[in-house]
Amino acid sequence: MPWVGSQFHKGDAQTIMALSNVLYQVLIALGMIYVIDTSAIISRNLNLLEGDLMFPSSVIGEIKKGKLRYMIDVLLPMIRVASPDHEYLKIVEETAAKTGDLMNLSQTDKDVLALALQYDATIVTDDYSIQNVASYLNLGFLNANIKRIDKQIAWIYRCTGCKKVFPGPVKVCDICGHEVKRHYDKRKSMIRKV
């Protein structure tokens, strides 16, 4: 495809638009669903056109102008734009809270995870927090451009002074007043490869 890993040319848009309806039907027929994160679009390495591609409508809001916006406008006829059901968002938020990733996920990130959960889809992302939560939800994920995570990670929040552990993100310790930081929890993290 002319846009995979390369720059867009305005002439390519007409060709893509002409083939979009037929191509979209072929992608759906193959039965593979991919939910694309903003980082996958930014990487410009979308070579996964062997299935049904979708992303949450919030991705469009994250990419407002320039070549990437043009790329989204060209790809829109071939990509389903959807919003996840509330029940799936709730599952994602509960899981992300348990892993300690909730504060690192934007609403778009949560939407990506919830759509993948709702449609039993594979996520395409370079975001490590999304990959980590996806692994806990037993969702498949592919990296777009950078190395993917190779194990599940659980995070804890610990005071830098008195070492008190907090159940969730806190900026300042209520005991000693020191800063609370997120740390990798070796005891809760899974050894299994993802």
UniProtKB/Swiss-Prot annotation:
SUPFAM superfamilies the record matches: PIN domain-like
Residues binding Mg(2+), per UniProt: 37, 150
Q: Which GO terms describe its biological process?
A: maturation of SSU-rRNA
Please give the Gene Ontology molecular function terms for this protein. magnesium ion binding; RNA endonuclease activity
Instruction: Please state the Enzyme Commission number of this protein.
Output: 3.1.-.-
Q: Please give the InterPro entries that the UniProt record associates with this protein.
A: NOB1, PIN-like_dom_sf, PIN_dom, Ribonuclease_PIN, VapC_family
Annotated PINc domain residues? 34-134
The highest taxon in the source lineage is Archaea
Name listed for the protein in its UniProt record: Ribonuclease VapC1
Q: Which organism is it from?
A: Thermoplasma acidophilum (strain ATCC 25905 / DSM 1728 / JCM 9062 / NBRC 15155 / AMRC-C165)
Q: What is the lineage of its organism?
A: Archaea, Methanobacteriati, Thermoplasmatota, Thermoplasmata, Thermoplasmatales
Whichever gene encodes this chain, its name is vapC1
